[in-house]
Design a protein with these regions (language model features):
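N-terminal intrinsically disordered, cationic/polar leader segments
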Residues: 1-88
Length: 88
């Protein structure tokens, strides 16, 4: 899927994550999380797996995590990517 515009999904509420996807070259992740020290690698892996499943290869993502579960992170990334993309 090609990312053609900026789109977001999620909230800044506790146990949620706000994901913003915008066009870019390669995959660039900017992760801000209250649990980054403990779960940063798991968050990054969940995002990369979700993008791979959607065939997204060029995008910049900004995540503002408030302790979201992996399933929530995956759902927010997928929703934001589909909103930003073409060829869904």
């Amino acid at each position: 899927m090609k990312v053609v515009k900026t789109a977001s999904a999620g909230t800044l509420e506790s146990n949620d994550v706000l994901v913003t996807v915008e066009p870019g070259e390669g995959i660039k992740l900017d992760i801000e999380s209250v649990v980054y020290q403990q779960f940063g690698q798991a968050i990054r892996a969940t995002v990369m797996d979700t993008l791979a499943a959607l065939d997204v290869t060029d995008a910049t993502l900004h995540l503002n995590d408030r302790g979201a579960l992996d399933c929530t992170i995956a759902a927010r990334v997928e929703t934001a990517a589909r909103r930003a993309g073409e060829g869904v």
